[in-house]
Amino acid sequence: MLTFVGLGLYDEASVTVAGRDAIAAADRVFAEFYTSRLIGTDVAALEAHHDTTIERRDRAGVEQHPEPILDAAADGDAVFLTAGDTMISTTHVDLRMRAADRGIDTRVIHAPTAASAAAGLTGLQNYRFGKATTLPFPWAHGADGVPGSVTDTIEANRERGLHTLVYLDIKVDHPRVDGDAYMTASQAADLLATNWDADALGVVVARAGAPDATVRADRLGALADADFGSPLHLLVVPGSLHHIERDALRELAGAPADAL
């Protein structure tokens, strides 16, 4: 059996009870943290909390050479961990299908995600979000500024009155950076303000799931000059706003009245 367990948003306590029980029952526990990570903890603390050993896999070890994971699942109960939910945004459906091809039973234990937190923390209605996009570091996509696909997605959503969830780039063990690199919301706002529309409304969500989670709404040009603290950050570019959403952004995110 191969069980996919989402760890939630922040630390070792963010996992669901069902996820915790699956980890406790597993013969072997694998994890990847190259797509995202739990900022409030580390692997050692996770191991101590769950009284287990976690075998960390890099991208190649999951996407190109998953045999150790699959072999463990064929021989017993294996668990595969990620931050957030294993099947949302960066999906591991390929690993699940490889297991199915080998006749290995699978199951998924879901967890809170950045997408659900963005709606819950900002007061924006979740069914009014359109297609999401990811804003990469300029050096990562090989050009200056913002890829056209990002602004095209935002504009297409806005034409339909929909909000855009903008995931911000994460680089783990990348040869261009020393350590891990996390795009901040102010960097993202600056890129969009410079290359798209400085007067457009943006909503920052910083450290969703943490005790000090922060939400701030303002024009992109103003957000570019702000400091939102430690990662992880994401950015929402709203479409048309329901009057309840306007009230929520004023009360929950400090949005200036003239920016709404």
Swiss-Prot record:
Recorded catalytic activity of this chain's protein: 2-[(3S)-amino-3-carboxypropyl]-L-histidyl-[translation elongation factor 2] + 3 S-adenosyl-L-methionine = diphthine-[translation elongation factor 2] + 3 S-adenosyl-L-homocysteine + 3 H(+)
GO process annotations (BP): methylation; protein histidyl modification to diphthamide
Origin species: Halobacterium salinarum (strain ATCC 700922 / JCM 11081 / NRC-1) (Halobacterium halobium)
Summary of the function given for this chain in its UniProt record: S-adenosyl-L-methionine-dependent methyltransferase that catalyzes the trimethylation of the amino group of the modified target histidine residue in translation elongation factor 2 (EF-2), to form an intermediate called diphthine. The three successive methylation reactions represent the second step of diphthamide biosynthesis.
Family classification: Belongs to the diphthine synthase family.
SUPFAM superfamilies attached to this UniProt entry: Tetrapyrrole methylase
GO molecular function, a single term: diphthine synthase activity
Keyword Methyltransferase annotated: yes
Quaternary structure (record): Homodimer.
Protein name, as recorded: Diphthine synthase
Keyword entries, A-Z: Methyltransferase, S-adenosyl-L-methionine, Transferase
Pathway field: Protein modification; peptidyl-diphthamide biosynthesis
Signal sequence, renumbered to the chain: none
UniProt keyword annotation of Electron transport present: no
Superkingdom, natural source: Archaea
EC code(s) of this entry: 2.1.1.98
Binding site for S-adenosyl-L-methionine: L9, D85, I88, T113, A114, L168, A208, H233
